[in-house]
Amino acid sequence: MYTSSDLKTWHYDGLALNKNNTNIPRFFWAPEVYKVGQKYIMYFSGNEHLYVAEANSPKGPFKQVGNAPMLQEKAIDSSIFYSLSGKPYIVFVRMNDGNNVWVAPLREDMYNIDTTSMKHCFSVSQEWEKAQARVNEGPCVFTRHKKYYMIYSANDFRSPFYGLGMAESLLPEGPWTKWEDNPFLQKPDTLVGVGHNSFFKDAKGRMRIVFHAHASAHRVQPRYMYIGTLKFYRRGGKEHVKVVDIIQPTTE
């Protein structure tokens, strides 16, 4: 867990989820924390399955809820959003067609997926997504102007062509339409392998985007975190987006 007062310099605040508070042996990634009532819930991937942990503070300590994953099959990269009517949904990645994106309602307890209502959002389809491996992953959804927008990553994360695309829908369960001018972020300036983003609104109400990129043009690891600002604009009668003011945070 890291905290910051300016988004530029971050301070280490200890482990949010300790291995002693989970039964998962390996492959921890993609945690997202949400305040639900008086609890903080972490949705994360572990050993290529979806899990939930909870805590009384956003800093933890988080403890795994139950012993079983949210789905019995392999799945990764979960993210939560609420419909315009306030219903909670989860987007995630199944591995039944390469890596492809699905959406489903969450049950009222926020810990379980309504598996009877799972919907396929999309698989690899656009040419830019076919540079390496069959991968659509890292989805996250936000609402804007009464529409749903989903940002996702495509290509293998080790590829320099790993990048971000946008899709939109009028309904939380889809159908989803990918933007024709994807990717909106791929190889910006000297960065390569950019992807698996999340987003938040800063103190000024600006939509900020967080993503990771390769260590360099010649080395994947360790991947570094970057923060930018999402700018929407219209051109040719269509909506477009770009990422501006990219910074690389530092740690103390």
For the regions a language model picked out, list residue spans one by one.
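Carbohydrate-active catalytic/glycan-binding domains of CAZyme proteins
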Residues: 1-252
